[in-house]
Amino acid sequence: LMGGFAAAATLPCQPNSKLYDAKLALKYSYSMENFYRQLESASVEDMDHDGRLDLYVPSLGYAVPVSGTMLVCASSYQRVQAATKIVQDLNALGFDLTLKSVDYEEYLTLLRAGNFDLYYGEVRLSPNFDLSPFFQSGGSLTYGSLADSTMQSLCNRMLVNSGNSYNLYQRLCDRGYLTPVMFKNYAVYTTRGS
């Protein structure tokens, strides 16, 4: 990934960190079998046989396509490229997603207004992998109404309990709040004698 400067991740923690629970990550790792099981449990299927997934909405009395827009900041070619690949892959599975690539200022405006269905973002976490900014009321990363007192409590417990993150990561994955893609690695290159 990214020319060797990133590692794929299932949990919101650097995979080489002692905080990364490989067993839990395996439970939530990529699996088409689990994907189709989740669709079935949510009653999502191609009901009108048009190649697109639909969700029956009882209050409406009919099915609606599973569609939406993924927002990405256009200032990074790599981010746009990654978001494009994600949208293409999800559409190949039957979703009806479009990608909206906008400049940084508009990206922030749309995030703050909650005017998106999905967004591809890049976040630099603190060394202790604190996720509080995503879940605390008024948090700097609480976009799309992610404020959740239970998640905030689990974040606090993880910080107090020396990185015991199992319950936090399990709830995060069960709820689908965040989907980690990768963690960047940084390197400093020097020449001998410098």
Where on the chain are the PLM-derived regions?
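Sec/Tat-exported extracytoplasmic proteins
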Residues: 1-5, 17, 39-46, 90, ...
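Append "and occasionally in soluble cytosolic enzymes with long acidic Gly/Pro-rich linkers
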Residues: 1-88, 167
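Periplasmic binding protein-like
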Residues: 70, 91-137
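Extracytoplasmic/secreted proteins, especially bacterial periplasmic and envelope-associated proteins
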Residues: 30, 34-37, 78-92, 106, ...
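Extracytoplasmic/peripheral linker and loop segments enriched in polar/acidic and small residues
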Residues: 1, 7, 19-20, 98-107, ...
